[in-house]
């Protein structure tokens, strides 16, 4: 049994050693991928019968807890950290840095919220407000996201740019990002465009908790730029920062008054720890 799972644990161990910090969602995804790529047909069913449970969950527990180890070759990532509302697991002998947590958060955000997932929601919203999409494209955030750590483990992240036009004086350049956490890097100059518009909008997905939004609001000034939050499952948009001049946009938000009240409450009542 250990021999059969050895390639799986080797693959997962190499990944853990490379990054040191992995989100729960990404770890579960890598476990699934390793089982699909390393086990032959019939091996998984036989192992699950022998072990009395689903392999994905058994391997996840083997990696992230001290109990129920399936093999001495199982990676050990029992150190658990909550960062910005997401759960992360770290190697116990690894002195993680804040940059590694940030990179792990960005990796998972890009996996679970690719910009394409939100594009149709945004396009439908703009059409309802009377706009036509005249230009769109995928652009890269070509930069070292996390300094020296990211130079060693470089990732390329994409965002989508839309140019929506309603009339000669109503046109918007809209950028769709995988997370609010990417916006500071865009603001630093890595997402410049030749497209000129009278207003900029950044659309980001919802998060598990308000923490990433509160951190962003407290640490960054976006000037005249608006930020909208998209709920992919409900196919809705609501404002986070800024008030649109076009009443047709305002009237198509799902619940703008409630969204703005929530932002006000977050700012007054919640404290975000520094990492």
What are these model-derived regions, one by one?
Residues 188-189:
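Conserved mixed alpha/beta catalytic, RNA-binding, or beta-rich assembly cores of soluble enzyme
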Residues 2-20, 25-71, 75-86, 91-159, ...:
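Acidic-basic catalytic patches of nuclease active cores, encompassing PD-(D/E)XK
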Residues 16-17, 99, 104, 110, ...:
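A sequence-composition feature that detects small, non-aromatic residues
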Residues 154-156, 171-173, 178-183, 192-275:
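Charged, structured surface patches that assemble and position nucleic-acid processing machinery
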């Amino acid at each position: 049994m250990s021999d059969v799972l050895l390639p799986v644990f080797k693959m997962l161990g190499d990944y853990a050693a490379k990054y040191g910090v992995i989100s729960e969602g990404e770890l579960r995804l890598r476990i699934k991928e390793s089982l699909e790529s390393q086990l032959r047909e019939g091996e998984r069913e036989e192992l699950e019968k022998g072990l009395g449970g689903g392999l994905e969950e058994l391997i996840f527990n083997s990696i992230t807890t001290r109990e129920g180890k399936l093999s001495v070759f199982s990676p050990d990532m029992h150190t658990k950290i909550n960062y910005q509302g997401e759960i992360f697991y770290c190697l116990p002998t690894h002195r993680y840095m804040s940059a590694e947590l940030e990179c792990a958060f960005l990796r998972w955000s890009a996996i679970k919220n690719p910009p394409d997932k939100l594009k149709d929601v945004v396009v439908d919203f703009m059409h309802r407000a009377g706009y036509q999409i005249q230009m769109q494209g995928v652009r890269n955030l070509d930069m070292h996201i996390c300094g020296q750590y990211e130079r060693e483990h470089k990732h390329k992240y994409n965002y989508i740019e839309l140019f929506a036009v309603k009339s000669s004086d109503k046109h918007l350049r809209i950028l769709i990002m995988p997370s609010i956490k990417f916006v500071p890097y865009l603001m630093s100059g890595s997402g410049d465009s030749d497209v000129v518009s009278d207003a900029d909008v950044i659309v980001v997905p919802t998060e598990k908790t308000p923490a990433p939004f509160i951190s962003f609001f407290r640490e960054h000034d976006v000037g005249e730029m608006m930020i909208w939050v998209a709920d992919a499952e409900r196919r809705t948009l609501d404002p986070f920062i800024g008030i649109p001049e076009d009443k047709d946009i305002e009237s198509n938000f799902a619940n703008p008054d409630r969204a703005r009240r929530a932002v006000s409450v977050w700012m007054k009542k919640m404290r975000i720890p520094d990492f």
